[in-house]
Amino acid sequence: FALSTYENHFGPYMWNRVGYCMVPFNSGAMEHATNIAYPKATATGTLTYQTLYAHELSHHWFGDLATCRTAEDMWLNEGWAHFCEFLFTEALYGTNSYLAAVRLNHESNLQFNTPKEGALTLSNIPQSVTYGDHVYNKGADIAHTMRGYMGDSLFFYSVKTYLANNNYKDVSSTDFM
């Protein structure tokens, strides 16, 4: 379901397969083109980790197809992958669920992330927060905001164009804009 959602919004999946494996580590996951590694603990037979699965799959567009040039622009990978979790939620559970999740992300970003990590820009961030909440939550917040201002038709057309113009390239935040 996530694969067809992402193909509809971002363009075709560019690899010949999607593989999954469970590995003996305790946190996080890691996508590689054609294969995604998840911690064994996420194989529960429930929907508990569905957004983690959707997040890692989305990296085939935001991270593998087009990737950030430097760690200081990690939001182009992780912020967009976090945005894709919300897009997956919307496709599966509807617009109201999407909007509630976006609202919670925005409030969390303002209430917790900014005081914890500081008021950082999305590009040229310190490497100490490359994988911080700021990159994920604020990055997704920016994508949601652009979607809201642009409307779905123009927003998703623009994202498809960005990805098509940057197939197998590294990009900076400046390139993105």
Locate each region found by the language model:
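Acidic/His/Gly-enriched intrinsically disordered linker/tail segments
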Residues: 78-141, 145, 149-150
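Short, well-structured active-site flanking segments
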Residues: 14-16, 70, 74-78, 92-102, ...
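Sec-exported extracytoplasmic/periplasmic mature domains
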Residues: 7-11, 62-63, 85-93, 147-148, ...
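Juxtacatalytic substrate-recognition/specificity segment
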Residues: 1-73, 84, 125-130
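Active/binding-pocket-proximal capping segment
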Residues: 24, 75-82, 162-164
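Amphipathic alpha-helical substructures
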Residues: 132-177
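An active-site-proximal "capping" alpha-helix that borders the catalytic cofactor pocket
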Residues: 2, 6-7, 77-89, 176-177
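Secretory-pathway/luminal and periplasmic proteins that interact with or process carbohydrate-rich
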Residues: 27-32, 67, 88-95, 166-172
